[in-house]
């Protein structure tokens, strides 16, 4: 019995690490793509063609049928439409981590949860300590966010000498950070709620539940119910991207039940397909039925949350996020009056809160939890590693810019906040790389000194 269970457990562990490796690889490469998009946006917004940059994102885009039309700017469809898919993937990541990952047990989740709370509370308090005007105080949440793609991307530049548990800790912290960001958006940056929209959203959610109950596995079947949920949340006055999180959390984490085991079905359909293909007078149309059933069995082999995340993640990482960066990172330097007291302090406060507040909050709360005996550091994770995670968490970039768009009404303050986010993200990345290289060299020197000659 034990001999049978061991290989199975080993295979499950290998699959889990393979998924994590693929996830980290996509995040690392997408961080470079995001950087290119942000630099392109800054250059474009400060070039002689700056007017075309603004004009492009204000281009109206209309959807509808007959007299029922809805028209908004391209910027709206990116920030409120495409970003819903990003938050859908975030919701699915949270769902998976709760089911079988770093958040699956209280013991595993306690330290990254506490560190994430510290990494949100300290930057927020640090920002407010600058004594802003009432309108600018709304930006307190801007420095609380972490851009997981950039943070993991910078960590990947340090190579495989960084222990895998450091990567897992950063990933868990960033996911909890995303949960807190979603709650902040829901409670602090959604307007007065119109409860009639909840009825529309509930109809969409009931449709999703109904499709899941009857075992519909095709993602296309959920597009219309998902759009209804998005519309309902938009009508309530809450930020419509929350629809993505809700739908992501509802995605099943277990494979759809089949009449026979998926692997047995794949074996049988493959045999049937080979038999028909080798027939002396076979018709190509004869292959369609076993091919269709084979694709269905392959699809049902994986849980929907794994399948959907694997499909959407590259599109989000290499499509939606770079487009978001291109549309939002283009700050015209001539349009931001940093000599004015308000915008100047907004930029400084955001930058200081991200660069100093993030590591201070993460390291201090982690130290306190360990000191009190409520948590222990994961294997191969030391205080230098926690400091590295804290520095990298100061890379707010896309998530911080997203919150800034919700927090600031004044264009000058918004531009200053974006400049603060961009400069802080760059500084945090450089500090993180420098600290990481120094830590690796120190660890290598200590190992060499302790080894027998």
From Swiss-Prot:
It is found in: Cell inner membrane. The keyword Cell inner membrane applies. It catalyses: Na(+)(in) + 2 H(+)(out) = Na(+)(out) + 2 H(+)(in). GO terms for molecular function: sodium:proton antiporter activity. InterPro entries: Na/H_antiporter_dom_sf, NhaA. GO terms for cellular component: plasma membrane. The chain crosses the membrane at residues 23-43, 74-94, 111-131, 139-159, 168-188, 191-211, 214-234, 235-255, 316-336, 345-365, 386-406, 419-439. Its main location: membrane. It is a multi-pass membrane protein. Pfam families: Na_H_antiport_1. Keywords: Antiport, Cell inner membrane, Cell membrane, Ion transport, Membrane, Sodium, Sodium transport, Transmembrane, Transmembrane helix, Transport. One of its GO terms (biological process) is regulation of pH. The keyword Transport applies. HAMAP family: NhaA. Belongs to the NhaA Na(+)/H(+) (TC 2.A.33) antiporter family. Na(+)/H(+) antiporter that extrudes sodium in exchange for external protons. This is Na(+)/H(+) antiporter NhaA 2. The gene is nhaA2.
């Amino acid at each position: 019995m034990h001999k049978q269970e061991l290989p199975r457990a080993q295979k499950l562990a290998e699959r889990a690490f393979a998924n994590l490796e693929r996830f980290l690889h996509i995040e690392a490469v997408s961080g470079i793509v995001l950087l290119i998009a942000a630099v392109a946006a800054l250059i474009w917004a400060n070039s002689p063609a700056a007017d075309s940059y603004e004009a492009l994102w204000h281009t109206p885009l209309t959807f509808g049928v007959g007299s029922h039309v809805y028209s908004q700017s391209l910027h709206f469809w990116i920030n409120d439409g495409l970003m819903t898919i990003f938050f859908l993937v975030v919701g699915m990541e949270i769902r998976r981590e709760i089911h079988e990952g770093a958040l699956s047990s209280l013991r595993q989740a306690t330290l990254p949860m506490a560190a994430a709370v510290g990494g949100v509370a300290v930057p927020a308090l640090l920002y407010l300590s600058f004594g802003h005007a009432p309108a600018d105080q709304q930006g307190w949440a801007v420095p609380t966010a972490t851009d997981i793609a950039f943070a993991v991307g910078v960590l990947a530049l340090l190579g495989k000498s960084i222990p895998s548990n450091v990567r897992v800790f950063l990933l868990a912290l960033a996911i909890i950070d995303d949960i807190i960001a979603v709650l902040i958006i829901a409670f602090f940056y959604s307007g007065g709620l119109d409860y009639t929209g909840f009825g529309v959203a509930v109809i969409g959610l009931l449709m999703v539940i109904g499709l899941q109950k009857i075992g519909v596995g095709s993602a296309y079947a959920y597009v219309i119910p998902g759009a209804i949920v998005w519309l309902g949340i938009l009508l309530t006055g809450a930020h419509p991207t929350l629809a993505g999180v809700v739908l992501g959390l509802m995605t099943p984490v277990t494979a759809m039940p089949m009449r026979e085991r998926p692997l047995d079905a794949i074996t049988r359909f493959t045999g049937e397909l080979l038999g028909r293909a080798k027939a002396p007078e076979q018709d190509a149309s004869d292959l369609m039925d076993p091919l269709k059933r084979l694709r269905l069995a392959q699809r049902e082999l994986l849980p929907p949350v794994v399948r959907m995340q694997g499909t959407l993640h590259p599109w989000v990482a290499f499509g939606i996020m770079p487009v978001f960066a291109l549309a939002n990172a283009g700050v015209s330097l001539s349009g931001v009056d940093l000599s004015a007291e308000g915008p100047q302090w907004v930029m400084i406060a955001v930058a200081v809160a991200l660069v100093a507040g993030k590591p201070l909050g993460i390291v201090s709360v982690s130290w306190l939890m360990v000191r009190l005996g409520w948590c222990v550091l994961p294997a191969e994770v030391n205080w230098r590693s926690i400091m590295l995670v804290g520095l990298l968490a100061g890379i707010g970039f896309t998530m911080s810019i997203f919150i800034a768009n919700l927090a600031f009404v004044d264009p000058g303050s918004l531009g200053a906040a974006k400049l603060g986010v961009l400069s802080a993200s760059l500084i945090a990345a450089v500090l993180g790389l420098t600290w990481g290289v120094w830590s690796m060299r120190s660890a290598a020197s200590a190992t060499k000194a302790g080894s027998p000659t």
